[in-house]
């Protein structure tokens, strides 16, 4: 309800999902898979990611996408949004430095599950020729759908902090050596994407 959400669109999106039996069941499943043990390192990332893929594949997009893309005006809302998909299990490795972005990219390119999703994301989210950095009107929804399909893959993206709406896989380009430009190009698909 709007009153209990207090203007927080992420809370409103969670409440809407909870009110729908299918969305609630799929959300309960991924939360159970991703929070097993609740201690760092206790989760089985492959099971967590599989449950997240099921959530987006089987849940109604009208309910799943608002959880992923809710807009926030304050850090508390942004942190809730960042935590929605249990990043400690699905996204990052707590206590460890992020790997070079080339590592998850290479895993994705070898994966029959991830590769077509990444290619679809690249096609749907690339700026149109001559449009500069702006997102063409007809691509916005396609890009968001393709982005949602990456959640639960080797290149699972998430919000990078609670101070912005920037998204990226859990990685950086500091240790990419002579492939730094390739690494930054991949990371830029997320952090410099005007369609997201």
Functional labels for PLM-detected ranges:
Residues 1-196:
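Mature extracellular/luminal domains of secreted and GPI-anchored eukaryotic proteins, especially small
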């Amino acid at each position: 309800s709007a009153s209990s959400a207090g203007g927080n669109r992420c809370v409103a999106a969670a409440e809407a999902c909870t009110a729908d039996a299918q969305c609630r069941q799929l959300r309960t499943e991924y939360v159970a898979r991703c929070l097993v043990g609740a201690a760092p390192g206790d989760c089985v990332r492959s099971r967590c990611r599989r449950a997240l893929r099921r959530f987006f594949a089987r849940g109604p997009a009208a309910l799943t996408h608002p959880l992923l893309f809710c807009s926030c005006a304050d850090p508390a809302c942004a942190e809730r949004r960042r935590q929605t998909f249990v990043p400690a299990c699905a996204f990052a490795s707590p206590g460890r430095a992020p790997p070079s972005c080339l590592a998850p990219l290479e895993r994705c390119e070898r994966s029959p599950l991830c590769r077509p999703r990444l290619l679809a994301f690249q096609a749907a989210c690339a700026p149109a020729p001559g449009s500069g950095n702006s997102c063409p009107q007809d691509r916005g929804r396609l890009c968001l759908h393709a982005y949602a399909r990456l959640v639960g893959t080797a290149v699972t993206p998430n919000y990078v902090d609670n101070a912005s709406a920037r998204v990226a896989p859990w990685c950086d380009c500091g240790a990419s050596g002579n492939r730094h430009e390739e690494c930054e190009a991949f990371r830029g698909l997320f952090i410099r994407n005007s369609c997201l």
